[in-house]
Amino acid sequence: MANCKVIAVTNQKGGVGKTTTTANLGIGLAQQNKRVLLIDADAQGSLTLSLGYPKPDELPVTLTDIMQNVINDTPIPDGCGILHHGEGVDLLPANIELSGMEIRLINAMSRESVLRTYINAVKPHYDYILIDCMPSLGMMPINSLAAADSVIIPSQPSFLSAKGLDLLMQSIAKVKRQINPKLKIDGILFTMVDSRTNEAKEIIASLRAHYGEKIRVFGTEIPFSVRAAETSGRGKSIFAHDKNGKVAAAYRSLTKEVLELERKTERFRVDAAR
């Protein structure tokens, strides 16, 4: 793969499986021999915690320091702040200090592209960079969308989650118009799906009908599972925790869909260049 693809995993609603998806998709891609960097762009540090760093506030270098260096135009040494996870992915961690970055960005030069500046510098080392976005529509998520090639939107199949999707679509469209014209939506991913309930089935069917013509809805659905919830904070992916379970199978399937998307894009690029 010649180019590094940057994917923002985003939804302004919390608790929809963003962090779990970022970690497991990233590790799924690493299992397919892709070089992967995961960026925790959420001040709660959920991705950092879930990958086995229980005290993110004690880490010497986090995304906040990296972004501050970009703002100050200070050189960033190769590999600075990057942690190597046992399942083959790299992590740029975050902690509560990132909440102050929102305020600092307001007065920064080229404030929307601070994260993009850093990502462009590390792109040559990776095939995929996945960003776990903050659940808001502030300056940090805008930085993530400005840096991304595409967006994956995890969403629970509930009416409240569905209502929030339209607002998120408007924000993505605005970033695309004003800051990052190449930004596209890879798809909506249904997470925490309890297929036993009729409500979930009805909402999924109506959302597939509503968005399906304009926006891809991934064929893979991530099922609700107590075992998946247990992995959070253990520092392991679902593959290491329960490799034969239904959630691991679903994330393997999602990984295949994401890789196939890239193959189609690559084929289209080659055909267009002929």
Regions found by a protein language model. Name each.
Residues 1-274:
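P-loop NTP-binding core
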